[in-house]
Amino acid sequence: MFSAKAKTYELKLEQTRCNGDWQAIPEVARKLHKHNSSKSFVCELAKIEASLKSALTAELKNIANVLEPKLIDNQYSLIPALPSARTDPLLSQLNSLNIQNATEDEKLQETSIRLLLYIVQRKFPEAVDLDWSPQGIPWTETSTGICILQATVLSSLAQYAQANDEVAYQYVRSAIGLIQNANIGKKPLPELTRWCDLAYSLYAQMSVSACSSQLERANILTTCLSYFTEHKSVNLLYKLVTSRQAIKYLEHILRTNTNGSKIFTKSPVKNLYLNWPQLVLDYGSLLCNFTSFPKAGDQNMFAVEFIELATSIWINTEKSYDITVSLIRMLYQLTGKCFQAQQIFRSLVFFLRHIEEFEEASEAFEIYKFLCVKSHERLARKNSDVAGSFSDIKPVFVDEPKSIIEVCSVMMTVYAQYLRNLKKVSEILDYITKIASDYDLLKRDDIAPLIYHTEGVAYSFMYYQANNPSLRERYHQKSVQSYQKCLEKQPTNTNALFHLAMQYSERRAITDAMQIVRRLLEVNPKYSIVSWHLLVLCVSCSEQYAAGIKLIDSVFETWGINHVNEDGTIEISLTNLTFNDRCALVDLLITKLALFEAEKGVEATLDIQDEIFTLFASIFDLNEYRISKEGSSDELSTLLERSTIQSIKSSKKISKDVENEKGSILGFSRKSSLKRSTVLSKKSHSSYKENFQLRRGKTVSYLNQKLWLTAASLFLKSGNDDQARSALLEAKKIDHECAWVYYLNGLSLLQQGKEVEGYEQLDVAHYLDPEDPLISTALAKCLLQGGYGPMHSRRNRADAILSSCTLQYGWDLPEAWYYTAEIFRQLGDLKQAAFSYDYCIQLADTNPVRRWSNLQPRFMNV
């Protein structure tokens, strides 16, 4: 009989081995041998195991700082190699043990330790020759059971290293079977957890080549992910390996299958698809944990791969706002872990543009462009004759020219449409021109259309900004040529067709514009509401107002806008409409009023305009747009109240002295101009959301004001000054700094014979918006026709205003050229007067019912 101490130390050794407390094992083994000499074999075996696994544990900790591709791509690298100076003595000790006197359990343990020694020595043939098999061996949650699992997993690694993939896969399946049959709890023994983790990570990796179907692989990955979700991993590296395989699989499935594919209805695939945001974010967090300091060159590999996979998945799924913001924050974390990783900033540009953070996208783009330029300079130096002097330059991940062009095309639209930055547009144009020349990209059919299209957008914007007629004409020709070259290679490029049609229409080539926009709508009838709006305005140029109204009605039917029911209710289905589509519908409603006015007169238009307000409230979920206002101490925010919506008819009953905010259709506060504070590039999730909702709220507010201004204009034309004033008060409540409020108020005062007051209001309007051609022309007309002040001074100022107007945004406004002709006539310059009169007539013959600038967005994503 052995003493109680012997039994105690035997249990202690078992417990210590299962817990992986390798430093304590030598002392426990010594005491066990002292009290029970018959346990000498297992004691020596335990000490060999402790020495070996202590070295492995230390090496695994170093892996976090050297996360190399071979570590994850080669499964056997998950067990690090150890120097022979460390392992040879251990193997000699193992060989010296008298295995003949060992029990069956001790023999199993010896085999597992021998396998581990062969693996760390990279003696894979010797490991395979052991011909280990777990078949028929009962499994228990003891040190022997752990060794059985360990030997099975190591045999799989050895077979894989010898290119016996099928045998390796069968071994790892056996290991998974052992784990599943054992029904291991959520908190297994630490050493058992280590080998379970490794088994599942190998299972996930080997599924790449071993599975006969994508569905089978999805099932395996789901099983592996479920294990790591339910169990706390001892080594996060194994969880990282599994997550990486799941992300790669999901990206492949999404990229190679359409959204309606049947594969997404299968349970395991559906589960991965529905949980992709959490999978991606968890994997990104693991990468951050495994990268403890900034990495450069090849060590960026996994971060760069993650960015590419996450971006591809995002592109091929529903791009929800919250998920996009989470990805942005993850990328910002990676900027502190990677060095010169262009892909981070490339994806940031896409994500930030999607959530409409255009200024921040611009900052990311500037960094991206800087890194691209520097990396290409490095490559150029390395490929030069003096490359040897630059041998210290670390390798970097350089974006392909095609990727650079794609990012530039996105930012070209941002700078042209949203930031209105001519300098940046010119810089991008120069940059892509240089890249196209350096890499001869115009000969590549996969990228040349995008280059031509981006150039077309640049020249269109330059055309719009030009204040020199000859320069404007040159930019027009260049933009048309660029779009045409794009369409030669991609005849059905809808965005290019739209941009070309817009360019023709703005240049008053109406026939060409109509031909192109009809071609666009044949390719895709539901391309955009703006494209139909463009066709309507083109039709109105030839005074086909009834046809334009019919087109608008057909658009309403196509996009789900139904007529008012007999009981006054409206049936609307807008579930598939984006926010921009809804905004475009509102502008289309205003154009419908303009067409009615041109076709049937002002009074007939007044009878239908109340429907516009009702539709407006139906198009937008007004309760969704809560916006904070600055500048009011007693009222910091207001709610868009659906219940307070009133028709325009009710405004007819408002007396002219009403100054309070009662009766406002949307109940916006009096002061709606907002001053956006400067924010850091890494905003909180709530900050992004607040800014996004604020922009949306301001847009809805702007459209609401636009409707009131339209109503005020109609009332003025009908001679209803009181109703016009009431409508203007409503518009002023929304934004008291709106130039058109003062413009229409000025026209109202002039209509009442109050010339001085009217002039002052027009002067304020011009001060607030000196670039608005209609305001400038109205002020010039007032100066020329007014009876106050010296005629020569009034004429000189009118001349200056009209000169600026006709050179810039009012070059195509007939009224501006008419009053310019009047000035020349008064000055006796009949030649210039005749030219201006003639140009006025030409423009009037092709004048739409509303200006082209009402078509927004002017530039679609290239």
Curated annotation (Swiss-Prot):
Modified positions (Phosphoserine) in chain numbering:
632-633, 637
Q: Please name the GO terms of the biological process aspect recorded for this protein, alphabetically.
A: endocytosis; intracellular protein transport
The reply to whether Lyase figures as a keyword in the UniProt entry is: no
- Return the protein name: Putative cargo-transport protein ypp1
**Sorted alphabetically, which CDD domains does this protein's record hold?**
YPP1 (cd23270)
What SMART domains is this protein classified in? TPR
- State the similarity comment: Belongs to the YPP1 family.
Task: Give the matching PANTHER family.
Answer: TETRATRICOPEPTIDE REPEAT DOMAIN 7, ISOFORM A, TETRATRICOPEPTIDE REPEAT PROTEIN, TPR
- Whereabouts are the TPR repeats? 342-377, 460-493, 494-527, 665-698, 705-738, 740-772, 814-847
Q: Where in the cell is it found?
A: Cytoplasm
Its function? Answer: Involved in endocytosis.
What Gene Ontology terms describe where this protein resides (cellular component)?
cell division site; cell tip; cytosol; plasma membrane
- In terms of superkingdom, the source organism counts as Eukaryota
Keyword set, alphabetical order: Cytoplasm, Phosphoprotein, Repeat, TPR repeat
